[in-house]
Each structure stands twice: as C-alpha cells, then as structure tokens.
Amino acid sequence: MTAGQPQVAPQEAASRSDLSSSDLLRVENLTKAFSGVEVLKNLTLGIRPGEILGVIGENGAGKSTFMKLISGVYSPTGGRILFDGEPVRIANPLIAQRLGIAMIPQEFNLINPLRVYENIFLGRELRRGGMLDRSRMIAEARRHFATLATDVAPDALVGDLSVAEKQMVEIAKAMSQESRVLILDEPTTVLSGAEIDALFAIMRDFAAKGGAVLFVSHKLAEVREICDRVLVLRD
C-alpha cells in the first residue's frame, strides 16, 4: 500500500527544551516500491540529537519499511538520506552500523547455535594480545543485561532462550555498538513490565547523551509515555 502524507505531532506530555535545531538523521522524499507498488512515498522528516521520535500507523502504512531503509536492509527507490547533514547511501546494515545506526528488529537476527555473548559481539569481537577475549565479552554482556534488569546468561546458547530473552539479546547487541541512532521496531511486545521500564530508562539515557531514538509501536500509551514527537504514517 502507498503511505499517505505523514504527520508529525509534538507530544503534550513530553518535550525537551534543549533539543538541537540541526537534524542528526534526515530523510527527504524517501520512497520505496516493491514490484512497482509504492509502500512508502515522499517521506520527509528529521530527527534531532536528544530526541525520541515515535512512529505509528496501520499495518501496511510503511513503518517497518521506513526503519529498514534507514538501517540498510532495503535500498530506497527514490529520495535521499542525510546523516549529520551529509547525504549517505546506506546500501547494507554494515554501512548503517559504521555510521552509528543500530536497529532492534521485530525479526530476530541471531544465530541459534552460537552463545549469547558471541551473538552480541559477532563481527566486533573483543581481543587481547591478538586472541579473543572471551572473559571480557562475557563481562560486557553481563553488564548490559544488568542495565536491562534481566538475567540472561551470556554463555547460554541462543537456541535455548525464550522469545523474551532473545529480544533482550538484540537490545544488548544494539547497546554494545556505541551507536548514535537507535531504531526499535515493536520492541516491547514480548517484554515484561519491569523489562519495558528498564528499556525506556535506557532510551531516555541514550537521548540525554545526544543520541536519537526512533520507536515504532502500536501501543499508544507507550508512545505517549516515552516519545517527544510522533510520526503518523497513513495508507
């Protein structure tokens, strides 16, 4: 389906006066079509350092497509993406990661036969003296899980984890990348109340330190609680 003209509304309950006037991430006339059918059309918006932007809309309105375009999963059909004011071509997720864009997807991007810490640091393994520093990676993973108020075992096999635990691994992986833009696609669906509270605290801290957060959700109460502005995508 083609997304209609987006609306960006300020949140009455949450606003920060110290947001920068310059966009950290901006898209202009961003369009994506599959087999000639436009699922996102001429989307233009920016997100500033220190801001949490909510993204809502009906199924098929283009929410996940938008997230995948700026995280390198999809390439746009038209329009452009700017990062720190410079046009960028995010051809794959590795480029997004190098720019400082991390995404926590709905579909887990984990390797079940590997251990939790191996998934978190896959492709970014910590080393000491040229050798893999397993103990440090486990310690770092444990630190991230403590921040998330969860007790996932860093040396457990991912294939043995519950759905909620796998979600926490994805979040810990994004946290470990020292990113500047954090994208969360329906992250709270399988989380407990305590885990959601911990996640929201991390999002607020990330934004307070100058990062930008895009939060996709169909739960309006959560959007009102955590977001500064809301992007509404319509069919």
Language model features by range: what are they?
Residues 2-235:
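Glycine-rich phosphate-binding loops of nucleotide-dependent enzymes
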